[in-house]
Regions:
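4′-phosphopantetheine-dependent carrier domains
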Residues: 1-174
């Protein structure tokens, strides 16, 4: 979604690296190199022609110990979080703590919220139509604004997963 300049909800299980790059071989080749770099493997055999469903299986075999985020996405994420949260002095650990401790959600949610902050705060148009952003794109200036953006990202992830979430009450659990 990041390299192809599309929203996650615009990618289908039958998409391939070719359809995501509109058949432009240089973009496809770059995407394949980025996938390999992200996973920390020399190459991902069969990735070029695989549907995303099949690619997920290939990736799980090629890099069974992969944990989000790898070399490629960590750089993009670091840059985006700096531009969104830098003025508020909020670092990635603060976001992790808010999702894990305040929302009381697991590590998978943390990774998904970070991905939403990367993907859903991009300005501009999707290559498949519509806006890229589902969340505000402007930098936050303080921690209350940061909390509001993080909370909105949690809600976007919940919507994508098709589940309801709510901030736990002071004495309760999620």
């Amino acid at each position: 979604a990041y390299a192809a300049k599309v929203r996650l909800d615009q990618i289908g299980s039958n998409d391939t690296t070719d359809t995501l790059t509109n058949g432009v071989s240089s973009r496809r080749n770059q995407l394949l190199m980025d996938i390999s770099s992200e996973l920390g493997v020399a190459s991902v055999d069969g990735a070029a022609e695989a549907t995303l469903d099949k690619l997920a299986q290939i990736v799980n075999k090629a890099a069974p110990n992969y944990k989000p985020v790898g070399a490629v996405l960590s750089e993009a994420l670091r840059d985006r979080l700096r531009s969104l949260f830098g003025a508020a002095g909020v670092k990635q650990q603060y976001i992790r703590d808010r999702v894990a401790n305040v929302w009381q959600l697991g590590e998978g949610w943390v990774a998904s919220v970070l991905a939403a902050l990367l993907l859903d705060t991009r300005e501009g148009s999707s290559s498949r139509g519509g806006d890229l952003a589902k969340l505000p794109t402007a930098a936050v200036q303080n921690k209350p604004e940061a909390d509001k953006l993080i909370d909105a990202a949690v809600e976007v992830v919940a919507q994508l997963k098709g589940v309801a979430v709510a901030l736990p009450s002071a004495g309760g659990a999620a």
